[in-house]
Amino acid sequence: MFSFYFNDNKITKLLMVGYGSTGKSVCDFLANFIDITVDISQNDDEFVNYDLNSYDLITVSPGIPLNKSPYRALTKFKDKIVSDIDIFYQYIKDTKAKTIAVTGSNGKSTVVTMTDFVLKDLGYKSILVGNIGTPALNKIGEKFDYCVVEVSSFQINLFNCVRFDLGCIINVSPDHLDRYQNFEQYKQSKLNLAKFSNDFFVYDVHNGIKYAGEYQIIRGAIYRNSTKLLDIVETKLFGEHNLENIIVVLNILDRLGLDINQAIDSIKKFKGLEHRCKIVKKVNSTTYINDSKGTNVGATIAALNSITNSKNIILLLGGVAKGGDFSLMIKSLDKYVKYVYIYGADKEYIESYIKGYCKYQLCNNMKQAFELSSQKANSNEIVLLSPACASFDEFSGYAQRGEVFQNLVAQLEQKS
């Protein structure tokens, strides 16, 4: 066994703040080294008992709110703070593997998953890590050609020395305003990815900063200069927002020097993400769509704008609002939504934004919202779960929320 080094410095004492899946991955990795003491702070009371000056390094889990007491004390030790991705980078930086990092408010999970899918379909060894669910250090023992990393603003705030071969920002819209002073601070946290990337581009539909390279969208299809490459109907996806996602992936592959025509064939096979604008079933001529991964206002707006051209959506909205500005969706509500059922911990907060702009009803929970929506829905209408909120008031995460919705649809079908 060997000692643990970071930036060529021997580390003998490390404090781990937070012990979720990321913290556990760091702990498991450090178990491979000798001569290192690791202390773990799992809650506020434990944290205040540690002398931060006494540690060589401090790893912080992304879920730790650095803007709140007692964790504000960490801001004085910025040079000591590292993320799990910094540690991962230290041990792969001398390999030939290429690293690609993607951040954004909406679309980043689709972009990184599609990129990873295409790379594998083209015959490369690729790993997909980060905010998508798999900590990077869990893959440290694997051999790979490409590492695709989904990064959140919280992770970027913790970066110390990582250098990605390519960084990309897409679709920055208000989110996590419970962790940031304002939208500008949140947006800047995303833009800071550029500081940690050798190559970098922005494709931001919301703010009009779109590096599209040689690609453009014309009438539901992607063109490269004047050559048509792909029509949305040739894919297993739907909506212009997915054409935007494909353009981001094509630009990533371009910058990696890969064959775009072969990549197009791979993209046609990509089935999209679970819980992201997925048609569950048509029951009694009503279509039920699961967009549980729509955890902020921008994601729900994108869903509303891509699903229909008519005012025929019954929307299930609610959960933990994270300080979101629901007034931003008023235009889309007016154009596409027949009725809204609002549920969850922040239902009154949401109501305060949309009251007077649409027909709605407050509900106790998502199940009640579903039952009422299925009763109200008429033929050829759509019941859409796109909550624009986090799910932790009622569920373990967006995936469980989506699964519960799918089960409710299945039960409804059995009764029909």
Curated annotation (Swiss-Prot):
Give binding positions for ATP: 104-110
Q: What is its EC number?
A: 6.3.2.9
EC supergroup of this enzyme: ligase
Top-rank lineage group of the source organism: Bacteria
Q: Which UniProt keywords apply?
A: ATP-binding, Cell cycle, Cell division, Cell shape, Cell wall biogenesis/degradation, Cytoplasm, Ligase, Nucleotide-binding, Peptidoglycan synthesis
Gene Ontology CC: cytoplasm
- Protein role: Cell wall formation. Catalyzes the addition of glutamate to the nucleotide precursor UDP-N-acetylmuramoyl-L-alanine (UMA).
Q: Which PANTHER family match?
A: UDP-N-ACETYLMURAMOYLALANINE--D-GLUTAMATE LIGASE
Name the protein family.
Belongs to the MurCDEF family.
> What is the name attached to this protein's record?
UDP-N-acetylmuramoylalanine--D-glutamate ligase
